[in-house]
Every structure is written in structure tokens, then in C-alpha cells.
């Protein structure tokens, strides 16, 4: 038995779709990191609505397991640990919805926000974005003041997408 989440992962990530067990495990760990980062960023963007925080169902594994923990049974960090730490930075730039959630043709749209938990405002603040879709790169930049303990929407990104399978990278 490798933990309560093994059946769910096998259903969502069929092991037969990967060349070996390590490739399958890496795919599931990568998914966990992306999922936690996206969820935490969204909750932080909401700030104090509805509850002002998030919780992990478990921090570490007590034995070898397929689980949602961010540390394994040897107390070594899983990739999700870095994703959680990054999503908890005092100042965070968030794109919502993330480009990875776009599934169709037409235009890819996302909104860019700054979450700032610092006690002092950021002034001046500069946010830059680079979006690469199917090898085409576009840039955006925004400047202004970010108040202490605030969330501010700084701008939007719209980019045409010619294919539903076009890969997008936003940084």
C-alpha cells in the first residue's frame, strides 16, 4: 500500500502513459507542485475573502507513500515544497487564469495582479510579463504604487492562439 491517493493518481495519470515508474512519479509530483501553487496564488489574490489563508492536508509522510505531503518520509522536500514557498512570498505577481487553463482556439486572456503582504508600500513598483505562445514572444510592463497589505490588478494580457494545443509560457 502506497497511500490513500494512489488510486486517484493512477486514474488521473495512468502509469501506462509513462515509460517507467520514475517518469510517472515525476509527472505526478510536477502536477502536485503546479496544482498547489495555482490554488495558493488564487487564495492569496482573494486576500481576506473568504477566510484569509489555506491549509495543507499533510506536511510530511510518516512512511513511503503516494500522498499530498510536501516532504517525503525521509523529510526530503518534494517539488511541491518549493512551489508552496514561492506562492507564499511576501510579494507575488499572479496571472489569473493561468495560461495553462486555456483550452481552446481564439484569444488567450489573463489578468495580472500583485499581492503584497508587506507593511510598507512598494513605490515605485514595476511588473513585467513575457508570454511565449508557439514560439512567438510578447512583452508587457506596468508601473505604479502598490499599497501595504493589498492586492492590486495591474493589467491584462491578451494574445491570439491559433491552435488548441499551442504551449504557453508566462513569466
Where does each model-flagged region fall?
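Terminal connector regions
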Residues: 114-116, 151-153, 158-171
